Regions:
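Intrinsically disordered, low-complexity terminal regions
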Residues: 1-226
């Protein structure tokens, strides 16, 4: 009897420590995440699911669709506390043409993000890891985070500002144009043409043996073949 009571108490504690809430969202093709949310993209339609270690913060989380953009953020009055051990959001999607992350969170996609024109922007110390299939891809990184891309694209335009890294060896691109400003690194692939510029102490490494190479370094950085 005593063991049963202990197990019951432990189960109640576990349930209390794992608060979950489902929310309906409208159609969207853009995702804008602001804050320390760990977002996982999954295929399909359905409710958005929030899972957290602190049930009290659920009422402070904003999930709204406006102008075809799903924004996930906190209310302005919200203050982070040490009781929050994790904060996860599962987002079903059918089509995306823009993904933005600001802050220390993360965005990960298990399924491939298909788009004619895809724009990915990371600002801050967070991480983005996406598998994509896009005709035109624009990837911008400003801060200390990591932006990882894999899959296929015809044209890649990359920009790194700060100390973060653009990791795109796994993104098979035909034509790549990349600029690194600061101490960060850009790792890209180009099979046809590459235009690479380094301003500062950062590095660009490229693979793919492109037929046309246009490279220039201003500062102590370096551009090399991988």
């Amino acid at each position: 009897m005593k063991k049963t009571a202990i197990l019951l108490v432990a189960l109640l504690i576990m349930v209390a420590a794992n608060a979950q809430e489902k929310r309906k969202v409208g159609n969207f093709t853009k995702l804008n995440v602001k804050g320390p949310f760990d977002v996982t993209l999954v295929s399909g339609k359905g409710d958005l699911t929030i899972t957290t270690s602190d049930q009290d913060i659920l009422k402070s989380i904003i999930t709204e669709v406006k102008d075809n953009t799903l924004t996930i953020s906190f209310q302005n009055s919200f203050k982070w506390n040490n009781k929050i051990k994790y904060l996860k959001v599962e987002v079903p999607f059918t089509a995306l043409d823009e993904i933005l992350l600001t802050g220390s969170g993360s965005i990960v996609s298990t399924p491939t993000v298909n788009s004619d024109n895809l724009k990915v922007t990371l600002t801050g110390s967070g991480d983005i890891d996406l598998k994509i299939n896009s005709k035109n891809t624009a990837a911008a990184l400003n801060g200390s985070g990591d932006l990882t891309l894999s899959g296929k694209t015809t044209n890649l335009e990359g920009a790194v500002v700060g100390s973060g890294d653009l990791k795109a060896f796994g993104l098979i691109a035909e034509n790549t144009e990349i600029t690194v400003s600061g101490s960060g690194d850009g790792k890209v692939y180009a099979s046809e043409n590459i235009k690479a510029r380094v301003i500062g102490s950062g590095d660009i490494i490229y693979k793919g043996n492109p037929k046309k190479e246009d490279t220039k370094v201003s500062g102590s950085g370096d551009i090399s073949k991988g």
